[in-house]
């Protein structure tokens, strides 16, 4: 009876997560597009629901909610479903919709979709060759073989996002990095934009007038010269056509310039708004957070470097280790085990909420940046793939943030994986991503004032 009640609780929560994923799809991702393929919406919502359920099971593990056998069953069931979706369903539909957008392959799109899926499976399986994740004890389609490969991709994505976020967050929040933008700078750039638009309009008028004159001149020549005039018009280009192509090239160059000026104007407006916002109480609060994140970023880069150089992986979770160091330093009586469990629960909860929120915000921005009416279905499925792999990898890495007694069932469910490898791999990619982001933001920050100083 208890297993049935536990299953009802899990099923109800999955329905709620599915509904939230459905609403997010409709209200955020597809609010500017017509939903033509409901299978995309269903696949995205299922991926979101089972991804969130894994985090729910981690919280239940710490709280001791549900029966141990029930939690183990739902861990296994959840992992098999999410792996089925990530390895079989989503890649197949990505291939199907990519092929559907190619006219030459319309008649055999199911066949070519299968070809795309088999290609994905080949490279997905070959991914295990250069990494120490394979285990000869398990079969080809065992859960360990699948999770290990999904984990490599997901941990790489997590490390890239974390490295960029650790650098970009203080850069975004701190007023120290803001350029000094005045109203006169914006007005000067807007004036240049308007002048460019006027030049485009005048040149397009010239093109229209020239084409009209060429058309009228051609009509007159056909009426006057008859058959020989037609032969001449075919063998020779009409007068003014060379000048017309030259003007069209100038228009194309001016339109590209106008696009750049428009983007620079929007950038200056946003910077000016950020300067005004930084003077408010909330802006000063985020400025303080920026300094805090700067210290965190430096510490994280330093620790990642230490872990890589000395091949080090923590044995205990950070909370327990931090409390032990503090208690030993202060020399006070303190129940480390009791409080580490509660603080770990709060920390894991914060990590879960911020991970889901941060990923959804990133996915929304990415979708609006590159989507179109034709590619939107493919992009949503790619985002679902990224989201699922990201959350599976979060469970792999979050295991280290849990006290030792709560790791056992997670370790048992995930199988005999090389957990230390994933932590070292995360440190390597995080360090590369963070240092690359520092270099990129430094060059962008240095180049921006020079760009706006040009007359």
Swiss-Prot record:
Coiled coil: none annotated. Voltage-gated channel that enables the transfer of anions such as iodide, chloride, bromide and fluoride which may function in counter-ion conductance and participates in Golgi acidification. One of its GO terms (cellular component) is monoatomic ion channel complex. It is a multi-pass membrane protein. It comes from the Eukaryota. This is Golgi pH regulator. Belongs to the Golgi pH regulator (TC 1.A.38) family. Its main location: Golgi. The keyword Transmembrane helix applies. Glycans are attached at residues 180, 243. It holds the Pfam family GPHR_N. The keyword Transmembrane helix applies. One of its GO terms (molecular function) is voltage-gated monoatomic anion channel activity. The chain crosses the membrane at residues 46-66, 79-99, 111-131, 150-170, 290-310, 343-363, 378-398, 425-445. It catalyses: iodide(out) = iodide(in); chloride(in) = chloride(out); bromide(in) = bromide(out); fluoride(in) = fluoride(out). Homotrimer. Keywords: Glycoprotein, Golgi apparatus, Ion channel, Ion transport, Membrane, Protein transport, Transmembrane, Transmembrane helix, Transport, Voltage-gated channel. It is found in: Golgi apparatus membrane. GO terms for biological process: intracellular pH reduction; protein transport.
